Amino acid sequence: MASIETPHHSKIETSVDVDVPALLEEYYVEDSIERFNLYRRLSQAVTDAEIDEWEQELQDRFGPPPESAYNLTMAARMKLCASGIGLVNVTVKSEAMILHCPDKDSETGKAFYDEGGFDKLLSKLEAAAGGQFKVVKENKRVKFMIRGLESLDSALEKLQAVSDGESTHVPIEQ
């Protein structure tokens, strides 16, 4: 898991979990050190353009990527988008996506809830997902569950619609 540095020097640690294979298969990139370097570069991407470049390099060097490599790229795009929103985790499984908000007592959580990030996210979710989501509070963390997603593509589309290119993350000054 990589942290993504925002212009205000706050770090959002975001992880993405998917229930489909999301990796560079050994038969596709045979050299283990090369696979490691490719994983590292992808985890350090901070823009969609960097992910696009990584994906193009993969195709140029190793040929058409298998579905597992495509899934890895989709997960990286989801991570980038979720980090900009201020989410700590995104889980996609069984045609559903769970968006995990930060813990209320954490530095990130205090800013997220007190400065309007949560309210922005909630209103964007209502517009993007309609009645197909529910809010679950678990301990000091809030989760949004979105149902009716057919693929990682549809999960990413929902996440991008919620993000709408505008960050709901409220940076923490250090």
Regions found by a protein language model. Name each.
Residues M1-Q174:
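Accessory helical-bundle/CTD segments and flexible terminal tails appended to RecA-like ATPase motors
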